[in-house]
Each structure stands twice: as structure tokens, then as C-alpha cells.
Amino acid sequence: PCSTHGRTPPCTEAILRAGIARVVAATTDPNPKHAGRGLRLLRKAGLEVRLGVCRVEANTLIAPFACHMLHHRPFFTLKLGLSVDGRIADHTHSSRWITGPAARKEVQALRRAADAIMVGAGTVRHDNPSLWPRPDGQRNPWRIIIAGKGPLPLDAQVFNDEHAKRTIVAAPRGWQPSCAQIIRGKGAAVLELPAKSLLASLARELGNLGIMHVLCEGGGILAGDLLQAGLVDELCIFFSPVLIGGPVGAMGLAQWKLNVAPRFSLRESRRVGHDLFIRMTPATAER
């Protein structure tokens, strides 16, 4: 429970006034202002305090908030839909649909849980997605496009629908001036960032906007870039029981030597329709 004054009085004061004798907490608050202080105050006041019940589940639940609080950036979930041989599309670059309807329904749930949905320029060019999963009345996501060197299609849905003001293009400095001007004129934002640290710089900008959770749904290039930048906090993969072959791999051109390759710990695995869902976090992450 919080122990400082903010928009509301401290929870610890309310607990003490209510005469509660025993408090059970799953985990400590990642906010450095609290971080166990409230529990210490309650113990000092004579209350019985039990900490750690359902700790793993609680830390998973608050992971985006904790990442934003401790690292001042969003929590990045990378979602991939893959064939069993690790392909995100066939040799014609068609990816509709690798996974089945049950998996696609779960993806919608992932989208609804995120503050922002991120894709690369290739996804905008090939698929022209709306990236707008929420029914009316629910909080609306930011839509983030990672631009490469070339222009983006100005007729894309993300620039022309009623939600264009919720679109952010992250581009290297000096990117396509005429294209950037037109996109800004449509109401979207264009953030020009250092090319060599574009994703890291973007993460800081998004943190400053209060964005806590980004779902990344781009293709292999974006997936590889995020991994190389150390910006994959959670990896969600839907495997379809189909073999495709060909060159369109899950990580684009990114590659690592085995001894330094990104490693993950399995957190969840289950069947979703005819597909297999697995959720992983970096092997060094504590949950």
C-alpha cells in the first residue's frame, strides 16, 4: 500500500483508521517513493503483514507499470505469428493468415491490453492496417510506425482515419521532408530521432508521454531491431502447424553467435485452437 500523499491520501493511513489487523500483499510497489515503506509502517504499527502471496502473478500483472517506473520507458511486448519452421510469411511476403481464428482472437486481446501498437514501414506498405482494435468507449491506443529511409504511403489508414492524431511516426532525422510535412498536416506526429539510436530514443519519448505498454507487431526487420536494442521485455509467439520454407525469417537480417544470442525463459505455453501459444521473458528477468 502507498504511504505518501498524492492525488489521494496514503492507503496506509486508511488501513490504520479502519482497524485492519492483517494485511496480505503480493509484491512491493516498484515506485521508489513507496517500495516497501508502507508495509514497514504497518508492521511498526503492530499489524500482521504477509508479503509474497502470488508474487509471480502480481509481478507479471504490473510489469508495464514497473518498467515505466524504474526505467522511464514502456514495457515492450513482441508478438509474432510463425510457421513451425519459423517463417512469418511465404516467399511472396503473404502472411494472411498463418495462424487460425482462435489465435487471431487472442491477438485482439493483446492489443486491447496495450497503450500503443507498433509496426514497421513494411507492414504499413503491405498490409495497410488500421491498428485500431478497441470498441467505442474504451481507451484508445497510440499507433506507432517505425519509418525506414523511404517514404510511407500517404493513403494509409493510420494517416487518414478519424484517429490520425493518435499516430506517431518515428523516423531518422532529416527523413523525407515532403512526406513528413504531409503526414503532420493530416494530424499525425512525426518524431525525428538519431538514426543510430532510434528505438532507444523513441522509448524515452514514449515514456515521457506516459505510455507504459507497447505491443510490437511489425515484421522481421522490426523484431530483429528491437532485440538488438534490448527492447523486448516479453515475447509472445503463436506457432501454426504449417511448413512454409523460404527466406522470410522471424528476425529479418538480425543474427547472433550462439554464445551471445538473446535467451528467454518460458513463462506460459498452451494450445489456442490449432496453434500453439508461448510467452517468454528475457532469461535475466526476475518474475
Place the predicted regions along the sequence by residue.
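Enzymes that bind and transform nitrogen-containing heteroaromatic metabolites
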Residues: 7, 35-40, 75-287
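Short secondary-structure boundary segments
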Residues: 5, 19, 67-69, 73, ...
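Zn2+-dependent cytidine deaminase-like catalytic core
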Residues: 1-57, 142, 162-163, 175, ...
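Short capping loops/turns at secondary-structure boundaries
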Residues: 31, 35, 51-54, 69-73, ...
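Alpha-helix capping at helix-to-loop junctions
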Residues: 44-48, 67, 120
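Proteins enriched for Cys/Gly/acidic motifs involved in redox and nucleic-acid/cofactor modification
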Residues: 39, 53-81
